[in-house]
Design a protein with these regions (language model features):
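Cytoplasmic C-terminal tails of single-pass
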Residues: 374-383
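Alpha-helical transmembrane segments
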Residues: 21-24, 357-375
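Hydrophobic secretory-pathway targeting helix
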Residues: 4-36
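A non-catalytic alpha/beta surface segment that caps or lines the substrate-entry region
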Residues: 40, 49-106
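Active-site-adjacent substrate-binding region
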Residues: 211, 218-344, 348
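Acidic/histidine-rich catalytic neighborhood of metal-dependent amide-processing enzymes
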Residues: 133-237
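Solvent-exposed loop/turn segments at secondary-structure junctions
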Residues: 60-62, 90-94, 105-108, 118-122, ...
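N-terminal capping segment at the start of a domain
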Residues: 26-71, 288-303
Length: 383
């Protein structure tokens, strides 16, 4: 039986190719997985207080004084952590206003948008008793906005570690479609913002906006997130798995309700512009579900849960730790693959290609050198 004899030079050739190749693979982060050591700072109680603050202004219906006062409240709170920008526009003859807060403005190469609407619906049309009364909007409006404010505080604390620019956007005129306010459609405030993104980007290209994360009805009791057709499914599944890893399996079920693209929410306009987007939203269509207060007067503080606010906020906080804080600073140092759309071959694949070419050159050079050596040795023996 023939024996295969391992030759040291063959092992050397293999290693000269393998070492630079694997080093490049790991350094680019394609398979990198880190364990973050950063503590979770999000406080559901603080977010709950921010919901209460918003409700204290009254019904935040577009064009009303409570809506204006609530926008000023956001601006005052955000000014502690971010650069504040007004976005004023008119819809159907009514003055509307989005509020933008920019954290880490110098990190212009990578931008993540966190959004929520803050207007409350003018008519509680699903309410069996008072369908013409306005909705308090504790969950559908105030909850997502409250989580944004608390995340602004949290991320400000670690701003020097975050390798990303974060936009906190509070949208007006989201919840007035189908008869809420005469002439209004759904999510018109966010549509205005998405159409005019370049105005806020200035000289920064649209490609710098890597991700849009929307929070809609995230503070109600019995939190159970759904999925939809406008959301990037791969990124959303990453969030669902992250939530389960944090112990929030009931909020991130393996069999969530699925909305098709018929769901019109604020993230739709960003997804339509090619920005990967994720909607954190519940199944609000089931009257016998865990939160049956959608577009009713029951959407009040009595049906808000600090646990739900904690789950939402801490899952998002951990996400940023893992993908936008380096391992050196206690983060996960993972690769935000959604940020490489259109540029992948210039970054990761390019690095791999260079590594392969380098490895191939080393192998070829080693083979040629070995052949030259053996040929010379053979000639010496002949002499």
């Amino acid at each position: 039986m023939a024996r295969i004899r391992a030759r040291p030079w063959a092992i050397f050739i293999f290693l000269t190719w393998l070492i630079p190749f694997t080093t490049t693979i790991w350094s680019t982060g394609i398979f990198a997985r880190g364990e973050t050591t950063l503590p979770l700072l999000f406080k559901g109680d603080t977010a709950y207080s921010a919901i209460q603050d918003q409700l204290n202004y009254g019904n935040r219906i577009p064009g009303t004084t409570p809506r204006k006062e609530c926008a000023n409240y956001f601006k005052s709170e955000l000014a502690q952590y971010a650069t504040v920008i007004d976005h004023n526009y008119t819809l159907h003859g009514i003055a509307c206003q989005n509020v933008l807060g920019v954290l880490n403005p110098t990190e212009s190469g990578s931008i993540v948008i966190l959004g929520a609407h803050y207007d409350s619906r003018a008519k509680a049309d699903k309410d069996p008793i008072s369908p013409d009364s306005p909705c308090p909007g504790a969950n559908d409006g105030a909850a997502g906005s409250a989580v944004l404010l608390e995340l602004a505080r949290v991320f400000y604390e670690i701003r020097t570690k975050l390798q990303v620019q974060i936009w906190f956007v509070f949208f007006d005129a989201e919840d007035q479609g189908s008869g809420g306010l005469s002439g209004f459609g759904w999510a018109e405030g966010s549509q205005e913002f998405a159409i005019n993104l370049e105005t806020f980007l200035g000289s920064t290209p649209l490609s710098a906006v890597k991700l849009m994360l929307l929070l809609d009805m995230v503070g109600g009791t019995g939190l159970r997130f759904a999925k939809d057709g406008w959301t990037n499914s791969e990124i959303q599944e990453l969030f669902f798995q992250l939530g389960r890893d944090l112990g929030y399996a009931s909020a991130f079920p393996t069999d969530p309700h699925y909305f098709s693209k018929s769901l019109i929410d604020d993230h739709k306009w960003f997804a339509s512009r090619g920005i990967p987007s994720v909607d954190f939203i519940i199944d609000f269509t089931d009257p016998s579900g865990p939160w049956p207060y959608h577009h009713t007067t029951g959407d009040n503080l009595a049906h808000i849960s600090t646990d739900s606010l904690d789950i939402t906020g801490k899952t998002l906080e951990r996400f940023f730790h893992e993908y936008y804080v380096s391992a050196v600073d206690g983060g996960g140092g993972k690769n935000p693959f959604w940020g490489m759309t259109g540029d992948w071959f210039l970054t990761e694949a390019g690095a791999i290609l260079i590594s392969c070419v380098f490895g191939a050159c080393v192998v070829l050079g080693t083979i040629l050198a070995f052949k030259a050596y053996t040929l010379k040795k053979h000639e010496v023996l002949k002499e």
